[in-house]
């Protein structure tokens, strides 16, 4: 495949509580897998900062940026690129957004960013030159009430195969899932990460390689088709091995964070790397 392969959705053990691989090891693994670069996009929201809220804000920012900085240091002198990003979530929804073009100073100046809904946060991000991509849109989790407990342990492959049958299930928002408890058992689809503020976005992740979630590929493609102004990317959403289960090919390798934003703005995407199929529908392409 021609082009330069970059994974734009990677979590480190240093700065994401759900990350299981140290940043220096991530760099080695991706280099061995044939990638040209990665973006460290650790989870940025209350669920990270609330656990260290006793620290002064500059120290909290240091903790958050540790994964990126460790990866950057590990790649020094190799030609492998490490870009800084965040996976932003506000305190209002369970939607996630990949954001590029920010830096330490922006984080220091905006300690209340997660307290704002996306529309208000996006105004600040865009004013700083940032770029916002909807992460894993139309993510799906099945649930069923079992007495006073909620069962959500369905395997991804089983959810995908069921969705392919076309059977329509009752749907509720992820945030309302506890309302199922105590009701008659019925298989229900929990919705999360769908386009709430499309005018605040610059792109959409049409393929997400995280094997622990199902994703409605029809809906993801529909979002992208309805917004031709969006850039489309594919990424792995790496938390643990195997690595490189998704990636985006660019027609050149962006030199730094600012160049990455320009490449996304100019839609310099030439193809996708698809690690495995966790979609209902195949990804059509850039």
Predicted regions and their residues:
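Charged catalytic cores and adjacent phosphate/nucleic-acid-binding surfaces used
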Residues: 1-16, 20-29, 92-108, 123, ...
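Extracellular glycoside hydrolase catalytic/binding regions
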Residues: 137-140
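An N-terminally biased module of ancient metal coordination in phosphate/nucleic-acid-related enzymes
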Residues: 1-91, 115, 240-242
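Active-site substrate-binding loop(s) of clan PA
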Residues: 111-120
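Conserved beta-strand termini and adjacent loop/short-helix elements that scaffold enzyme active sites
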Residues: 85-87, 135, 235
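Surface-exposed amphipathic alpha-helices with a cationic face
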Residues: 31, 69-76, 119-133, 220-228
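Conserved beta-strand positions in the central sheet of alpha/beta enzyme cores
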Residues: 39-40, 133-134, 205
């Amino acid at each position: 495949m021609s082009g330069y392969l970059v994974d734009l959705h990677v979590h480190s053990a240093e700065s994401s509580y759900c990350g299981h691989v140290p940043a220096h090891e991530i760099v080695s693994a991706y280099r061995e897998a044939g990638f040209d670069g990665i973006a460290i996009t650790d989870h940025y929201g209350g669920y990270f900062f609330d656990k260290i809220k006793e620290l002064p804000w500059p120290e909290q920012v240091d903790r958050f940026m540790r994964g990126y900085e460790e990866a950057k240091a590990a790649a020094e002198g190799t030609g492998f690129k490490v870009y800084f990003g965040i996976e932003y979530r506000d305190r209002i929804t369970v939607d996630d957004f990949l954001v590029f073009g920010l830096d330490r100073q922006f984080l220091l100046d905006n300690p209340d960013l997660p307290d704002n809904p996306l529309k208000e946060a996006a105004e600040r991000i865009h004013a700083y030159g940032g770029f916002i991509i909807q992460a894993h849109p139309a993510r799906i989790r099945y649930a069923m009430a079992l007495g006073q407990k909620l069962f959500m342990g369905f395997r991804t492959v089983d959810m995908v195969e069921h969705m392919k049958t076309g059977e329509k299930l009752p749907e509720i928002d992820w945030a309302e899932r506890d309302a199922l408890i105590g009701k008659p058992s019925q298989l229900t689809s929990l919705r999360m990460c769908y386009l709430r503020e499309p005018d605040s976005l610059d792109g959409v992740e049409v393929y997400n390689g995280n094997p622990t979630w199902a994703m409605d590929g029809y809906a993801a493609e529909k979002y992208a088709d309805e917004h031709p102004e969006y850039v489309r990317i594919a990424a792995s959403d790496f938390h643990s091995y195997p690595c490189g289960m998704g990636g985006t090919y660019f027609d050149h390798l962006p030199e730094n964070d600012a160049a990455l934003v320009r490449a996304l703005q100019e839609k310099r995407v030439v193809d996708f790397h698809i690690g495995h199929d966790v979609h209902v529908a195949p990804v059509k392409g850039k």
